[in-house]
Amino acid sequence: MKKISLLGSTGSIGTQTLDIVNQYPDQFQVVGLATRSNVELLATQVQQFRPEIVAICDESKLGSLKDAIASMDYSPLILAGEQGVAEVARHGDAESVVTGIVGCAGLLPTIAAIEAGKDIALANKETLIAGGPVVLPLIEKHGVKLLPADSEHSAIFQCLQGVPDGGLRRIILTASGGAFRDWPVEQLKYVTVQDALKHPNWSMGQKITVDSATLMNKGLEVIEAHFLFGMDYENIDIVIHPQSIIHSLIEVQDTSVLAQLGWPDMRLPLLYALSWPERIYTDWEQLDLVKAGSLTFREPDHDKYPCMQLAYAAGNAGGAMPAVLNAANEQAVALFLAEKIAFLDIPKVIEKTCDNFRDHNRSQPSLEDILEADKWAREAVLMAAEGLGTENKVVSLK
């Protein structure tokens, strides 16, 4: 029985993780739950899974959460704020922590879990993208396992099982192409929020669905792969694979290529991250290659996906630049979802923000440097958005 704490329990990753726990109660037990603000769903989860400790990041919701739990027949420890989430992450009984918090908000609780000696099932890619220079030394110092729980990096990790040290030659990340893979570039100026949220293959949260549409998601995954697997950026490629059956591939030194295949289902990488090195039997739909039909591939259109190149540039710049890229993207996507800027403005404000940070970058940033860069980038995006020409905006900034 593996005891786990779950950060971001009410989001897409969190609810799918709890589906796994519910299906395999003899394998996994939830001892900690944390979320940002969804009191109603968190209370339902507490009632079902009966964790020892619960936290809600939004401190204004603490009273509502306590009221919702008061009528239950047991009393978990209830906390609030960033420190409360960190306490869930470092909770003594947990062996593994699933990090499903969206964005850079997952960095500090993940560090808390690592410092407490917890293994990490990493579904929050921003932890490594922004904090890689700090997180990786901590992983080594505390001797914990860092297991990727997103589909692409789980696929790479699975393909690497049995590959000797030095055997990896190239990583090939597959991308669905997002909501606009079949749209002509000329039509992207007319994109609405509703258009961007129509992912063709995966069921995900709003932010990551927009990231898929811009291909920033894949660019961020390139940076994550660099940190996870120690691969130079020039040896990490992206290919559009519309069917999302091949979740990623590796090329080894003799040019053999290994791939991991499966229906697009986030539970698969989550289960592997929780159960590694074991393989647990599931009754989920098995992959039928005949039913899947043709598997096709094409090169990403650089004109359609400028965010992809911004990510490579930030990765190569190193230091705190990936943190700036990540924060700028989070802020830009939030503005787009709020209809404050247009879809095509997302890469514009990110590029301007990264350019303005270039002279302030440090090659070996501390955690404080990274957090400061994150804060600076969010403010810089707001300023860049204010300076956009009004002809490109969905509505003007308030």
Curated annotation (Swiss-Prot):
Disulfide bonds: none annotated. Its EC number is 1.1.1.267. NADPH binds at residues 10-13, 38, 124, 126, 205. The keyword Endoplasmic reticulum does not apply. NCBIfam families: Dxr, PRK12464.1. Catalyzes the NADPH-dependent rearrangement and reduction of 1-deoxy-D-xylulose-5-phosphate (DXP) to 2-C-methyl-D-erythritol 4-phosphate (MEP). This is 1-deoxy-D-xylulose 5-phosphate reductoisomerase. The gene is dxr.
